[in-house]
Amino acid sequence: METLSFFKAMADDTRLKVLMLLSLKGELCVCDLQNALEISQPKVSRHLAELRRNELLVDERRAKWVYYKLNPAMPTWMNDIISTSSQNSHQYLEDCLSRLNSDCSNC
C-alpha cells in the first residue's frame, strides 16, 4: 500500500472508526460494525470493501458471517499509527464502543 492511499483511506470518518475499532477489538463482523457505527449494512460493506482494496483489512468467513481484522501484513508504521490513534481517541470512539459493547441485535 502506498502512503497516500493509506492516509486517504483514513481521511473518511467511517473508515477511520472501522480501523480504530478493529485495532481495539481485534476482529468484528459486519453486524457489529453496523451496530457500532449506526449505519446501514450496504454502507458498512462499501467502506470495508474500500479498506480491503487498500490492503488494510483481511476477512474470514465463518458459517454465514464474515469477520474482519487489520491486515497482519500491513507495514508496522501503518499499524502503529492506527493503534496509537485508537488508544488515544476514546472520546472520539465513545459512542461506538458503547454500542459495540451492548448486544448486537442484528446478528
Model-predicted regions and their roles:
Residues 13, 25-29:
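Short capping segments at the starts of secondary-structure elements
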Residues 8-14, 72-73:
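Short helix-coil-helix linker/hinge
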Residues 53-62, 69:
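Beta-hairpin "wing" of winged helix-turn-helix
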Residues 16-20:
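Pre-recognition alpha-helix immediately N-terminal to the DNA-recognition helix
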